[in-house]
């Protein structure tokens, strides 16, 4: 059995055990652990828990508001990275302050801030509203969830510093940020599991998507650590994509599918497709993201190893990458048909346009990402020059519209207020969609031209 399949087998087994524990329940898990967990979430924190309010909806609101701020910061760094990629000396004046940014560092910072600050916080915040609604209960601890949002924000600040300067005073800054982030994530998981234990009925499929999205992050790391994959390039690549397919894709699917029912007023078009999304998200390898595992290695304080697949691992990885088309197509079909069901086009509803854009864009960007990943896995590396632009497209044309479209659709219900201006929301949508699609398409054409020049033996103009 190759390393890829070994790691995935451990992950699949742990996911199955988790499902059995949650679905059937154990008396020691529901009685003793619940009491201890509630104590840990609130009273164990002492006076610190009184710094935040515990009103209903305060936690989702805090997470979503901070995600908006991080999205703004991520957009700035992403733009500056693209700018320096075409004009390396554009920010040369900053060297007088001792700061010498490069396109690579700014792009990396933009990706981290957008992904973990903007998108992840929007998904977690929306999930804190969606899960209790689906389960007919309240969030276990609004106070703890609100307080943890600031801890998560602090981890993003550390990430942002670490992406610019990875080591300060001999300390690995990225690893410190990961440690803080893991603590915050474990608190979120504990809070949501306690919410799940207080349910009044069965668990709907979107709730399973959100729960598995949260727990797949630590389960992926545990599986890779147990099999020793974290020290290999292929293992680092796998962990990166397992988290992408679990935490980000499944969480997005759960939140978006609920939001589409809110936007359209229709029931989900197909429950069968929901099952395909969950099983496919767990049992395949997500294609979106980088073509190596350097980012995962940096987050874990490890040296980035060369990505080498041996023992048939490349065949396994390529097959599972191709099979990930099933959950992606199932998600796009279910969300779009639910959104447009009954021939009711609600373009003015909060988040309708954003969810529609993300659901439409996910298929072509998935195909582009699939070609990139299989090209890298097989060692061909013929189109690797487009990876950065395709990755940025996946963030800004798919993940950002889906996560923030859902947040916009749910935010009025969370706060009990209306959006300040629908006109501004519409303007923001057109600016984002036109800017992302047009700007990145031009950048993609530039990448293709650059690869053609390099293949022809012409000096790289950049």
Which ranges hold each PLM region?
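Membrane-interface helix termini and inter-helical loops of multi-pass transporters
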Residues: 230-234, 298-306, 378-381
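Cytosolic juxtamembrane amphipathic/interface segments immediately preceding
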Residues: 45-59
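Alpha-helical multipass membrane-protein architecture
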Residues: 265, 299-315
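Loop-rich catalytic cores of soluble enzymes, especially ATP-dependent carboxylate-amine ligases
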Residues: 234-242, 307-311
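Conformational-control "hinges and anchors"
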Residues: 347
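Extended, leucine-rich alpha-helical cores of fungal transcription factors
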Residues: 200-208
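Inter-helical loop and helix-membrane interface segments of multi-pass membrane transporters/permeases
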Residues: 165-173, 230-235
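Hydrophobic cores of alpha-helical transmembrane segments in multi-pass integral membrane proteins
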Residues: 3-44, 60-87, 92, 100-135, ...
């Amino acid at each position: 059995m190759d390393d890829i399949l070994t790691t995935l087998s451990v992950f699949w087994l742990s996911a199955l055990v988790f499902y059995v524990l949650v679905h059937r329940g154990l008396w020691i898990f529901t009685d003793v652990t619940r009491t201890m967990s509630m104590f840990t979430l609130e009273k164990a924190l002492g006076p610190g828990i009184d710094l935040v309010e515990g009103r209903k909806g305060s936690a989702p609101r805090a997470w979503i508001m901070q995600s908006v701020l991080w999205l703004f910061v991520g957009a700035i760094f992403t733009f500056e990275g693209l700018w320096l990629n075409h004009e390396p000396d554009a920010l040369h004046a900053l060297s007088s302050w001792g700061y010498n940014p490069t396109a690579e560092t700014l792009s990396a910072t933009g990706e981290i801030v957008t992904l973990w600050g903007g998108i992840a916080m929007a998904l977690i915040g929306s999930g804190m509203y969606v899960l209790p609604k689906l389960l007919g209960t309240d969030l276990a601890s609004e106070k703890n969830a609100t307080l943890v949002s600031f801890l998560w924000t602090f981890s993003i600040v550390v990430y942002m510093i670490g992406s610019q300067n990875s080591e300060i005073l001999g300390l690995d800054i990225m690893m410190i940020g990961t440690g803080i982030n893991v603590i915050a994530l474990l608190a979120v998981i504990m809070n949501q599991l306690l919410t799940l234990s207080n349910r009044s009925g069965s668990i709907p499929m979107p709730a399973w998507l959100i729960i598995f999205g949260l727990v797949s992050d630590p389960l992926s790391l545990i599986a890779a650590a147990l099999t020793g994959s974290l020290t290999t390039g292929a293992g680092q690549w796998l962990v990166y994509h397992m988290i992408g397919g679990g935490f980000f894709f499944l969480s997005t699917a759960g939140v978006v599918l609920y939001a589409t029912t809110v936007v359209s007023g229709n029931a989900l078009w197909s429950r069968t497709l929901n099952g395909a999304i969950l099983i496919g998200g767990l049992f395949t390898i997500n294609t979106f993201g980088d073509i190596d595992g350097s980012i995962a290695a940096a987050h874990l304080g490890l040296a980035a190893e060369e990505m080498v697949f041996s023992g048939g691992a490349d065949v396994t990885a390529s097959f599972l990458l191709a099979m990930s088309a099933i959950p992606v197509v199932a998600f796009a079909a279910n969300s779009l048909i639910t959104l447009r069901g009954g021939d009711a086009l609600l373009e003015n509803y909060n988040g309708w346009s954003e969810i529609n854009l993300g659901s439409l864009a996910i298929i072509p960007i998935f195909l582009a990402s699939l070609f990139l990943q299989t090209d890298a896995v097989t060692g061909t590396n013929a189109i690797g020059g487009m990876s950065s632009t395709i990755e940025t497209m996946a963030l800004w044309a798919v993940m950002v519209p889906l996560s923030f479209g859902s947040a916009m659709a749910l935010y009025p219900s969370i706060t009990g207020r209306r959006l300040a201006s629908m006109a501004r929301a519409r303007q923001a949508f057109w600016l984002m969609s036109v800017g992302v699609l047009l700007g990145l398409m031009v950048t993609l054409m530039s990448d293709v031209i650059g690869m053609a020049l390099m293949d022809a033996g012409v000096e790289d103009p950049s």
